[in-house]
Amino acid sequence: RFDSAMLMKDLPRASGDHYRILDCGMKSFPIEALSHAPLTAMMKCVKENGIKPGDVAEIKVEVIARAADILGDPHKYRPDSKETADHSLPYCMAVGLVDGMVTPLQFKEERVLDKSLIPVMDKVKVVANEEFEKLFPKFQPSQVTISTTAGKSFTKRVDVPKGDPRDPMTAEEIGVKFHALGDSVIGKAACDRLSAAILGMEKIGNVRELTALTVRA
């Protein structure tokens, strides 16, 4: 028997109450789910320490065993399609390091097949960390250690990926993703207008004002 009262259980009843919809995760990268935490760790490590692509000698990636098996097998070091590349930890780490971002643009055929990324992919070493198994799936622990050509070493660990409600994307990061998805469809200017409308949706008097912005000129 369907319990209709369940639909109302624990719903916010005052303006200061917390809405669970705000706890939804958002994929910050268009890649396989288990790749998000290690890529987050690397991007943070690079930014925090001012690491340049040419400075990197090795990127050691510690993840749970299933992530290492699925995302770091030998074939993933030579992706030949978008479908392989977005499930390849070596590719995602390499293109993220070189391009400074991982968006749909990084999975266009010409980028996936770009041979200049091969030496960078070969610097990525994916290993399983048994200690991380105890924390999964509540957490998705990943640790990245970047060794530089100057002999320095930088380590960053994250337990949740960027986009998890415990480490939410910023408005700027959401904007980058939005434009990466929409610019080629409706154009940058239209994307700017649509983004502003969505972020200010509570000010819109009629939903037609919003839907009109989704029509290609």
Spell out what each predicted region is.
Residues 1-217:
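Terminal-appendage/accessory-domain detector
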